[in-house]
Regions:
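Hydrophobic pocket/interface hotspot
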Residues: 18-22, 28, 46, 59, ...
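Beta-strand/loop substructures that line and gate deep hydrophobic ligand-binding cavities in soluble
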Residues: 75-123, 130, 134
């Protein structure tokens, strides 16, 4: 499996204020419903269509105020993957966040989409940090 790690971003809040949102897919509904097709979510699962692929995700592990592990849950995504949302509280008003992706990619897929996956992780974590810092 290939590992992709986002840049670390700073959120000016304690981890206890961030964790409830990143550990519950239903809280993402307002932000994502108009960006993907057929968005459906419960606390621990979600599914949607993105660029012709049906994506299903399931939260498989939660460690309060530390991390959330998400894995693929059915769908038509042509790879096995897992990703983590990691939180590290440095002080009461300073939590660092990063995303880690493990994906099973053959050599050709790695060459075709590896840089896009890395860029996507970096953009996603920047967006998460910006959103939490605006609240």
């Amino acid at each position: 499996m290939q590992e992709y790690i986002s840049k670390q971003q700073q959120i000016f809040r304690p981890a206890s204020q961030i964790y409830p949102f990143v550990s519950n897919f239903s809280f993402l509904s307002p932000a994502l419903a108009d960006k993907v097709e057929d968005w459906q979510a419960t606390e621990d699962t979600c599914s949607f269509k993105f660029k012709g692929f049906t994506v299903g995700l399931r939260i498989v592990e939660k460690v309060e105020n530390k991390h959330v592990k998400v894995m693929g849950d059915g769908g038509t995504v042509p790879m096995d993957f897992a990703f983590w949302i990691q939180l590290h509280q440095v002080s009461e008003g300073d939590t660092r966040i990063r995303l880690v992706l493990h994906a099973e990619l053959n050599m050709m897929m790695r060459m075709m989409i590896g840089k896009k996956l890395q860029s996507g992780l970096d953009q996603a974590v920047e967006g998460l940090a910006a959103a939490f810092n605006r609240i």
